[in-house]
């Protein structure tokens, strides 16, 4: 599947939100948009621009390109409940996101690689599709040959217990996690407003 291969740091500066650990450190030093006039850009932002920016935030945070993101939106519309909430929940159930939330990788991009390279199993079966939808009760763990990889061990050792969300039970010692439940929207702390995205696609 195609992926964004540009500078995530530049995108982070343009959107004003850290999209990776590296970008977070960079934004602390240079909290303004890139380019010659990054520090002096002013003026009223249009409604469309605000909606587009929120969509870009969501796409880059979860590492998804436009076609797939629009498909998630269509699925969210088809489900019962609030469309925006449904959209966020679908993104949170992605396997690469659950791997990231479980502390197995310091970034979603790294988690995506772990999944794509076939290092993980779900309920005992190998899954190498980052977009795989995890369900309540699913057990995510590493294949025998992939256990105790340096990057994973390092990420887990640096992850405080407070990082792990209430809807995922993480066993750091055995490098496994159980997806307990689909999180409620208020439990997901991410810097975007999905309602503006819904308004954008509803036009």
From Swiss-Prot:
This is Small ribosomal subunit protein uS4. It comes from Chlorobium limicola (strain DSM 245 / NBRC 103803 / 6330). One of the primary rRNA binding proteins, it binds directly to 16S rRNA where it nucleates assembly of the body of the 30S subunit. With S5 and S12 plays an important role in translational accuracy. Gene3D superfamilies: Ribosomal Protein S4 Delta 41, Chain A, domain 1 (1.10.1050.10), RNA-binding S4 domain (3.10.290.10). One of its GO terms (molecular function) is structural constituent of ribosome. One of its GO terms (biological process) is ribosomal small subunit biogenesis. Part of the 30S ribosomal subunit. Contacts protein S5. The interaction surface between S4 and S5 is involved in control of translational fidelity. It holds the Pfam family S4. It comes from the Bacteria. Belongs to the universal ribosomal protein uS4 family. GO terms for cellular component: small ribosomal subunit. Residues 93-173 form the S4 RNA-binding domain. The keyword ATP-binding does not apply. Keywords: Ribonucleoprotein, Ribosomal protein, RNA-binding, rRNA-binding. InterPro entries: Ribosomal_uS4 (IPR022801), Ribosomal_uS4_bac-type (IPR005709), Ribosomal_uS4_CS (IPR018079), Ribosomal_uS4_N (IPR001912), S4_RNA-bd (IPR002942), S4_RNA-bd_sf (IPR036986).
């Amino acid at each position: 599947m195609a992926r964004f291969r540009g500078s995530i740091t530049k995108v982070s500066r343009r959107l004003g939100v850290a999209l990776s650990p590296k970008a977070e450190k960079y934004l602390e030093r240079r909290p303004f948009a890139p380019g010659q006039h990054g520090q002096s850009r002013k003026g009223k932002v249009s409604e469309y621009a605000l909606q587009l920016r929120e969509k870009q935030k969501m796409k880059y945070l979860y590492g998804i390109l436009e076609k797939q993101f629009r498909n998630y939106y269509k699925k969210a519309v088809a489900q019962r409940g609030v469309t925006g909430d449904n959209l966020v929940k679908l993104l949170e159930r992605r396997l690469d996101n659950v791997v990231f939330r479980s502390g197995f990788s310091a970034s979603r991009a790294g988690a995506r690689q772990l999944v794509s390279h076939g290092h993980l199993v779900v309920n005992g079966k190998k899954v190498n599709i980052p977009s795989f939808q995890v369900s309540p009760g699913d057990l995510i763990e590493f294949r025998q040959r992939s256990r105790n990889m340096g990057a994973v061990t390092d990420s887990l050792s640096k992850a405080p217990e407070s990082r792990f969300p209430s809807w995922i039970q993480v066993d750091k010692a055995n490098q496994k996690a159980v997806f307990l439940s689909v999180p409620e929207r208020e439990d997901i702390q991410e810097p975007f407003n999905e309602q503006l995205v819904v308004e954008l696609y509803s036009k």
